[in-house]
Amino acid sequence: LDPSRLVNEASGGNFFHVGHILDIHNYPDPQMPTPGIFGNKQILVLGEFGGLGLPVDGHTWQEKNNWGYQSFKNNDELLNRYTSLINDLTPLIPLGLSAAIYTQTTDVEVEVNGLMTYDRKIMKMPLEKLQQLHQQLYNKGLVKMK
């Protein structure tokens, strides 16, 4: 093995307390294990959370039977719930959260939980609002590090 590279033993499960990263998946809400149970000697990562579904007519892989972990009727509902999820990450930082990855950047096949549509033509939430939410979260993480 190359000792200059971090090892993620298993993304999402089957943890054997080896490797450098403990990568947990939780849907839809971001959660971390109780401190002291997992990850005492590992980097804690929320490798997947979110999965908020909003199909956009004319921009899906298929017309029916699309899904997300939680479904919404319009962009405003989606943005309100997404904002809540991002805000829920802040209290996890003092518990050791080092990274969080939203599922997912774009819709894929039957999953409509992307920030943008399958064809990449429509952002489901205003980019400026996403930038603002993410910057606020980043700034809170920097404050916790000091």
Question: What kind of feature is each model-predicted range?
Answer:
Residues 1-122, 132, 143:
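Substrate-binding/catalytic cleft of secreted carbohydrate-active enzymes
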Residues 128-129, 139:
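Extracellular/luminal recognition modules and glycoprotein regions
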Residues 135-146:
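Surface beta-strand/loop "capping" patches
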